[in-house]
Amino acid sequence: VSVSSNGLNAHNFYCYINNQLLEYKKMIDLRDLFHGLQNQMLASLNVNREFIEHPGSKGEATEQHWIEFLRTYLPDRYKVDKAIVIDSTGNVSEQMDVVIYDAIYTPFIFRQNGFMYIPAESVYAVFEVKQDVKGHIEYAAQKVESVRTLKRTSIGMIDSGKTAAARPLTKIIGGILTTTSSYSGNNTVKVQLNNLKGLQTLDLGCLCDTGSFYVDYNETEPEGIAPTSNIEDNREYIRQVYESRKVKEVKFSDKEVSLFTFFLQLVNYLKYIGTVPAIDINAYLKAIHAKIDEDI
């Protein structure tokens, strides 16, 4: 039984915002909250799908919805954009629909002719966005590979006033985001994910009205290579880890919570990565035969 005093409910909290008394419950059903946010996102994606007829415009609107979702809920240390990823040798990836990169340790971003270019060292994750997952797993994998093959650098940095050694390169998360799946069940997607090899392997994805998934891999520690010895060995170490991947399990969520199981899995992977390695700016400046002083 609710207990009230002067019209106020003892089971609720109250606060003033803009001189208005607002009421909210002391307890909230998290499942209802997740369902509400999921339905809101799905409704927006379905509006794009049903009412935007031009394929290019429909795709751009869908990409922007995913970007805005991740910008809203990821911590401020991460930035999210559509971009092309570059390395210090001038190589570039394919244009990625969603790139999650470091907001602090990204010393420069190029914008030219409507395209954004982000250094590979700053990238945490990349995703391909499609309306339907059908026929697009391999395509997404090839685009993810175009980022992972880039030549990343890593140098020492100052941490809490002390010089820290160059951090070993971290994995780059790769995945696919879609509004729907026209496959009957999840087995076809699982088979396609199992067929991916090496740098093309995907880590997770969200098929919004079907379920999210993550891929659990068995990986083999490379022999005879120390990931901390030098940057060349470090690159080879990461490559061999990817090449050793064997799918242990592809796990799908319930469709009712696909969006937030995907999001929380992504956050967990980002937490595991920590912070991206410090970029070697002088490696990029070699292109213009210049160099900066690294100390002060």
Language model segments and positions:
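Intrinsically disordered, low-complexity Ser/Thr/Pro/Gly-rich regulatory segments
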Residues: Y24-Q95, I100-I296
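Short hydrophobic transmembrane-like helices used for membrane targeting/insertion
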Residues: V1-V3, I17
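Short, Lys/Arg-enriched N-terminal segments with co-localized hydrophobic residues
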Residues: H11-K26
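Short hydrophobic alpha-helical segments enriched in small aliphatic residues
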Residues: V3, G7-N12
